[in-house]
């Protein structure tokens, strides 16, 4: 198992690629919340932990938190992010 860090910015529709979005706009989520993301990860049956008091490096003034998720070694970060977006729609 490996750990993936998931910042809400990675799947946020309002962000550009330069601002940190990693998924295509077609599947990105409008204003994703940490609690909503964690809920979907839990439903997927994956082990995770939430870090609430952390700020996204590109926006160090804003505390948004992130989620650490344990996934299979064969799962890429982008593949996992796309799966989360599809599950949240």
From Swiss-Prot:
Q: What is the protein name stated in its UniProt record? A: Signal recognition particle 19 kDa protein
Localization terms from the record: Cytoplasm
Provide the leader sequence positions. Answer: none
Keyword Ribosomal protein included in the entry's annotation: no
Q: Which molecular function term from Gene Ontology is one that the record holds? A: 7S RNA binding
Give the species this sequence originates from. Answer: Methanococcus maripaludis (strain DSM 14266 / JCM 13030 / NBRC 101832 / S2 / LL)
Q: Which GO terms describe its cellular component?
A: signal recognition particle
Its annotated function is as follows: Involved in targeting and insertion of nascent membrane proteins into the cytoplasmic membrane. Binds directly to 7S RNA and mediates binding of the 54 kDa subunit of the SRP.
User: What's the superkingdom here?
Assistant: Archaea
Subunit details: Part of the signal recognition particle protein translocation system, which is composed of SRP and FtsY. Archaeal SRP consists of a 7S RNA molecule of 300 nucleotides and two protein subunits: SRP54 and SRP19.
Q: Which family does it belong to?
A: Belongs to the SRP19 family.
Presence of keyword Cytoplasm:
yes
**Source organism phylogeny:** Archaea, Methanobacteriati, Methanobacteriota, Methanomada group, Methanococci
């Amino acid at each position: 198992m490996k750990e993936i860090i998931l910042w809400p910015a990675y799947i946020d529709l309002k962000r550009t690629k330069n601002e940190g979005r990693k998924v295509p706009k077609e599947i990105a989520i409008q204003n994703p919340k940490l609690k909503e993301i964690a809920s979907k990860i839990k439903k997927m049956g994956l082990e995770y932990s939430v870090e609430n008091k952390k700020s996204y490096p590109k926006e160090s003034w804003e505390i948004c938190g992130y989620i650490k998720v344990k996934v299979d070694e064969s799962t890429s970060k982008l593949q996992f992010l796309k799966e989360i977006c599809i599950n949240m729609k």
